[in-house]
Amino acid sequence: MERAVQGGDAREQANSERWDGGCGGTITPFKLSDESPSLHEWRLHHSEEGEDQDHPLGFKESWSFGKVVFKRYLRYGGTETSLHRALGSWERNTVNNAASRFLGFGQIGCTYSIRFRGSCLTISGGSRTLQRLIEMAIRTKCTVLQLTPSEVEGNVSGGSPEGIEAFEKESE
């Protein structure tokens, strides 16, 4: 017989989910397992590349609902196949299912963050704006993964991406 995960048990399961890289569980928003490189693989990759060049093995992303954080490192090679796979690492329904375990009657903070090529972009809002946050996270992830290193530098110094100002006004 299946047992519903609630309260402290849900947080405990979410914390273990963050570290063991499991996927497809009852509460994780991610569909793919964590693919963090081993220390040996990381060193090998960076010793072959020039010090001033940025050729990441992948990217980090996270979803958080209140104090519960789900993190993943995913491999990304910059190809169309790799992009399609990376964009499918989570879907609207998996995020909604995970969030529903932590959302109660009160408003809590929800955040999506992606780190790629040394730049981190985070979008957040209250639980009442979760659907809009998911839409923005989809667009943000697609845009960030398709940028060249020089475009990333330009966007970092240019401020927030298009649409953030409107979202901040809506969520107030």
From Swiss-Prot:
GO MF annotations, alphabetized: RNA binding
Keyword list, A-Z: Host-virus interaction, Inhibition of host innate immune response by virus, RNA-binding, Suppressor of RNA silencing, Viral immunoevasion
InterPro entries, A to Z: Tombusvirus_p19, VP19_sf
GO annotation, cellular component aspect: virion component
One Pfam family, short name: Tombus_P19
Region (Disordered): 153-172
SUPFAM superfamilies with a match to the protein in the record: Tombusvirus P19 core protein, VP19
UniProt GO BP: symbiont-mediated suppression of host innate immune response
Main function: Viral suppressor of RNA silencing which binds specifically to silencing RNAs (siRNAs). Acts as a molecular caliper to specifically select siRNAs based on the length of the duplex region of the RNA.
Entry protein name: RNA silencing suppressor p19
UniProt source species: Pelargonium necrotic spot virus
